[in-house]
Amino acid sequence: FFVVFPELGSPPAWTQESLEALNARDIEYNGQKCTRYEISQMQRARERAVCKWKRRYLAEDAAGADTTASAMKLRQARQSLADFTRATGGRVDSARTSVHGFGRSEGSKASYAARKQERFNAANTELQQMREAGTIKAKGRLIESPSAPNEINFASDHVLQRWAERGMGPMDAERIIRSSKVAMSQRNGTQTCYYSELGFVAIGQDGNVSSIGPLDEGGKKLMEVVKKHGIPHS
């Protein structure tokens, strides 16, 4: 029965036909027949995920933290929602995925960060395959070149010997670092090897240069992978 409040009007009139339609398992998803209610709950879960990662992105951005991971999660959540509605014949209601403070500008920045990271992920996958095949020897994870340490130390006897062997000096190292757009994060992040068309320079967190040289065949192949995946390199 329905409790009737006259000021609210008549109670909803559910017909047997409308109830049967609501409970009918007539929507197929992922190989199963689902009711409209079940589908709506699955969609709400995906909409909540989009909102969650929008809020996380805003919080990290406001704190000056790296937003790459949350941007990637947001992109995945949006894609999951879009795929779900496409598969079930539904539609995305932007009102249910709206988060205060996350507008067009924030959406564009998050999408750009996610696309850039996807390129690096794809390049790292290919580099690992080349490493396993013995095509390249360079170890580490391909990243966007970070800022170099404020002070760079070239005093190592090993580095000085390498300079002599390869005809390179401190000015070459500085030019490579300035022109570098990509690097390899090595030794659990304690060393960064900067790459550019001019060569490579490996620098520790303490600013000590551990190696320097022109691009060998492996280095050239690494840069080819960078170009292939549309990552800025010069």
Question: Each predicted region: which residue ranges?
Answer:
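Activation/maturation switch segments at domain boundaries
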Residues: 1-133
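Ribonuclease/tRNase effector modules and their secretory precursors
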Residues: 107, 111-234
